[in-house]
């Protein structure tokens, strides 16, 4: 169950402020068509930049979704940082999803690599290698290595990273966002098995997407 408490992410305040100012300005001069248009834009920006609180599951040996959206792929893929073949859980965010990204596990950010690139549809396979993206290598308390990739999409034109290498964060903690539709890939370390399948809708910091297998415990 999602927590009803909702705030606005700081990245959205400039856009919301400008749209609100434009709405008031056009209303004061009697240009009601433009006032309504900017009122709708203000609502859209508030909706897009919403940042609801989430109840993150507790317990050992589990990972939560790093993003809101729909699972579009769960399959072995070459990890862009380690070069190893790992199970990847791919989550696609449309423009109506919450776009704040959260940590899948508690751990330390060991490496951050930004790649400038193109802006193909984030659901396409080639988006993982050709699009603008940001790779994160996370080390958990047991030494497990997790790779997380923010991928900009067709409309998304800015990846926001709020962390630095060496930062230690908790499971479900906010680490960044991507604006206006995008994708996040999570590469699982050995010993973890996915708990979601293609087509499922997940929520950042809340939906369990992987668990440690009995053999890996």
Curated annotation (Swiss-Prot):
Cysteine disulfide links: none
Catalytic activity: a 1,2-diacyl-sn-glycero-3-phospho-L-serine + H(+) = a 1,2-diacyl-sn-glycero-3-phosphoethanolamine + CO2
Location within or outside the cell: Cell membrane
GO biological process assignments: phosphatidylethanolamine biosynthetic process
PTM description: Is synthesized initially as an inactive proenzyme. Formation of the active enzyme involves a self-maturation process in which the active site pyruvoyl group is generated from an internal serine residue via an autocatalytic post-translational modification. Two non-identical subunits are generated from the proenzyme in this reaction, and the pyruvate is formed at the N-terminus of the alpha chain, which is derived from the carboxyl end of the proenzyme.
Membrane topology reported for the UniProt record: Peripheral membrane protein
Primary enzyme class: lyase
Annotated keywords: Cell membrane, Decarboxylase, Lipid biosynthesis, Lipid metabolism, Lyase, Membrane, Phospholipid biosynthesis, Phospholipid metabolism, Pyruvate, Zymogen
Modified residues annotated as Pyruvic acid (Ser) in this record: 182
Main location: membrane
Site features described as Cleavage (non-hydrolytic), chain residue numbers: 181-182
Record GO terms (molecular function): phosphatidylserine decarboxylase activity
InterPro entries the UniProt entry points to: PS_Dcarbxylase (IPR003817), PSD-A (IPR033175)
Role: Catalyzes the formation of phosphatidylethanolamine (PtdEtn) from phosphatidylserine (PtdSer).
Record family assignment: Belongs to the phosphatidylserine decarboxylase family. PSD-A subfamily.
Matches recorded under HAMAP family: PS_decarb_PSD_A (MF_00664)
Protein name, as recorded: Phosphatidylserine decarboxylase proenzyme
UniProt organism field: Nitratidesulfovibrio vulgaris (strain ATCC 29579 / DSM 644 / CCUG 34227 / NCIMB 8303 / VKM B-1760 / Hildenborough) (Desulfovibrio vulgaris)
Protein encoded by which gene: psd
């Amino acid at each position: 169950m999602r927590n009803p408490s909702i705030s606005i992410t700081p990245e959205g305040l400039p856009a919301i402020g400008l749209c609100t100012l434009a709405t008031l300005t056009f209303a004061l001069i009697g240009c009601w068509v433009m006032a309504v248009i900017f009122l709708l834009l203000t609502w859209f920006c508030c909706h897009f930049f919403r940042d609801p609180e989430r109840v993150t599951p507790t317990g050992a040996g589990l990972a939560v979704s790093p993003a809101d959206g729909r699972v579009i792929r769960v399959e072995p893929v070459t990890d862009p940082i380690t070069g190893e073949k790992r199970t990847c859980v791919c989550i696609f965010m449309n423009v109506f999803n919450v776009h704040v990204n959260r940590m899948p596990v508690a751990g330390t950010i060991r490496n951050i690599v930004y790649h400038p690139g193109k802006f193909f549809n984030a659901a396409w396979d080639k988006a993982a290698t050709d699009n603008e993206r940001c790779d994160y290598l996370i080390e958990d308390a047991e030494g497990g290595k997790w790779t997380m990739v923010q991928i900009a999409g067709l409309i998304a034109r800015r990846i926001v990273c709020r962390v630095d290498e060496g930062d230690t964060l908790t499971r479900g903690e906010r680490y960044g966002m991507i604006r206006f539709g995008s994708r996040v890939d999570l590469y699982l370390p050995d010993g973890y098995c996915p708990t979601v399948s293609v087509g499922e809708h997940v929520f950042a910091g809340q939906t369990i997407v992987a668990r440690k297998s009995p053999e890996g415990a």
